[in-house]
């Protein structure tokens, strides 16, 4: 009886160890991929939607969420510009 119990316990422990090794070998998923591009014009009231459309057409990839930030004008810039920062859907295609 002891021998059978010992074999069963060692089998369970072996299975647990093997599953932990497989999980660690798979590696961590890639970190989020954010891209930021400068566009002409201001963000406006619907800046996030505007950035979403501009970034998808520019990157030719789906994006998950965006933020829009107007560039402050100084003496060197005469036109309105804004930065669009968006998170790409597929972090494996991050450049």
Swiss-Prot record:
Disulfide bonds join 33-94, 43-68, 51-84, 66-86. Residues 1-26 form the signal peptide. Flower buds. The keyword Translocase does not apply. The gene is SCRL23. PANTHER family: DEFENSIN-LIKE PROTEIN 232-RELATED, DEFENSIN-LIKE PROTEIN 245-RELATED. Keywords: Antimicrobial, Disulfide bond, Fungicide, Plant defense, Secreted, Signal. InterPro entries: SCRL. It is found in: Secreted. This is Defensin-like protein 232. The keyword Signal applies. It holds the Pfam family SCRL. It comes from the Eukaryota. One of its GO terms (cellular component) is extracellular region. GO terms for biological process: defense response to fungus; killing of cells of another organism; signal transduction. Belongs to the DEFL family.
């Amino acid at each position: 009886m002891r021998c059978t119990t010992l074999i069963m316990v060692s089998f369970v422990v072996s299975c647990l160890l093997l599953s932990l090794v497989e999980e660690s070998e798979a590696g961590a998923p890639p970190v989020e991929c954010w891209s930021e591009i400068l566009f002409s014009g201001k963000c406006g009231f619907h800046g996030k939607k505007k950035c979403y459309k501009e970034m998808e057409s520019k990157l030719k990839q789906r994006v998950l969420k965006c933020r829009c930030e107007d560039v402050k004008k100084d003496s060197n810039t005469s036109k309105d510009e804004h930065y669009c920062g968006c998170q790409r859907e597929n972090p494996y295609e991050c450049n």
